[in-house]
């Protein structure tokens, strides 16, 4: 819940119609430079130059999410690490993967703050497109966030997110509750 609360504080600065510009301001306030380039990968961070490069080909909601991911790693690294200290990881690699996952969670929570998002889900009867427009997020980001709404006393409905490719292969799945996959 501490990660959610920290992300909600960041979310208060992501207001207005130009969320990308607001996100750039948040990252640059941390002493990092943001630039856009025509490149296939979504993001690249140059540690030496403290420069975040984002794909100019990515949708604005993806660019905003990637900047919030970088902000999580830069400004809230100690919080992420303290949260991860509660886990028992078998290797440093496993912890690194979990840290990136937690930073991604932070990014989603910054773009779609818990209480506001839960209320919007109820108000729209979980209409993914309406929620996506309201928060400037993609359908996939909204579906993923819906699957994480498990705060005690303010839980969302059990929501299962599954992404499937054209061949029917599951390429991503997420749920905070149990769902058995064959």
Identify what each model region corresponds to.
Residues 1-182:
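Short juxta-domain linker segments that transition from a proline/glycine-rich
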């Amino acid at each position: 819940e501490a990660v959610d609360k920290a992300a909600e504080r960041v979310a208060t600065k992501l207001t207005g119609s130009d969320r990308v510009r607001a996100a750039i301001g948040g990252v640059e306030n941390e002493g990092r430079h943001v630039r856009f380039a025509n490149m296939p990968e979504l993001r690249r961070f140059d540690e030496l130059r403290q420069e975040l490069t984002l794909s100019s080909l990515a949708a604005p909601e993806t660019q905003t999410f990637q900047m919030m991911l970088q902000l999580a790693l830069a400004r809230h690294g100690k919080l992420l690490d303290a949260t991860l200290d509660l886990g028992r990881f078998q290797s440093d690699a496993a912890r690194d993967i979990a840290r990136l996952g937690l930073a991604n969670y932070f990014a989603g929570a910054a773009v779609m703050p818990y209480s506001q998002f839960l209320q919007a889900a109820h108000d729209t009867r979980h209409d993914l497109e309406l929620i996506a427009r309201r928060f400037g997020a993609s359908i996939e980001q909204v579906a993923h966030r819906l699957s994480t709404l498990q705060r005690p006393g303010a839980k969302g409905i059990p929501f299962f997110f599954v992404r499937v490719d054209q061949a029917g292969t599951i390429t991503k799945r997420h749920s905070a509750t149990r769902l058995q996959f064959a």
